[in-house]
A protein has these predicted regions:
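Terminal domain-initiation and capping elements
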Residues: 1-141
Length: 141
């Protein structure tokens, strides 16, 4: 769907009816047990699978992904896990969260920009200890 503004649905008469598609941001986070490459990659992969699955997103829907890590996590780029999942044509970026005193450590966050059916509301996914970050979201786990 990348680059398309509307998706067509064929009726039985053969005409094409268009439905609106919009660009939506999907948010999520996961906690990481240790500053180790394997732990960061595993937590990122679980987070991405959950976000994509719960929102019915496919690789072709994705526009970009922005990953952030808390300052205590620097053993690996989360984008490596996304590439291993097959997101080879999706622009990915990694950055460090600001070090706010007293904030939760050991956290990977992601914001996925994707095209989605207009009727669908985004399901934001917060796994592990990060569920405490956004208790206000119905989609938070």
């Amino acid at each position: 769907m990348s680059g398309r503004r509307a998706a067509g649905a064929r009726s039985t008469a053969g005409d094409v009816r268009l439905r609106a598609v919009r660009l939506i941001a999907f948010r999520g986070a996961n906690s990481v047990a240790a500053n180790e490459a394997g732990a960061i990659l595993d937590a990122t992969e679980v987070l991405m699978h959950e976000l994509l699955g719960r929102n019915g997103l496919e690789t072709g829907d994705l526009v970009s992904c922005l990953f952030t890590l808390t300052p205590d996590l620097n053993a690996e780029f989360p984008a490596v896990a996304a590439r291993r999942m097959g997101l080879s044509r999706v622009p990915l970026m990694c950055a460090q969260e600001i070090a706010v005193p007293g904030s939760m450590t050991g956290v990977i966050r992601v914001m996925i920009h994707a095209y989605s059916d207009d009727r669908r509301e985004p399901v934001h996914v917060y796994l592990g200890e990060t569920a405490a970050l956004r208790q206000d979201l119905h989609g938070a786990q």
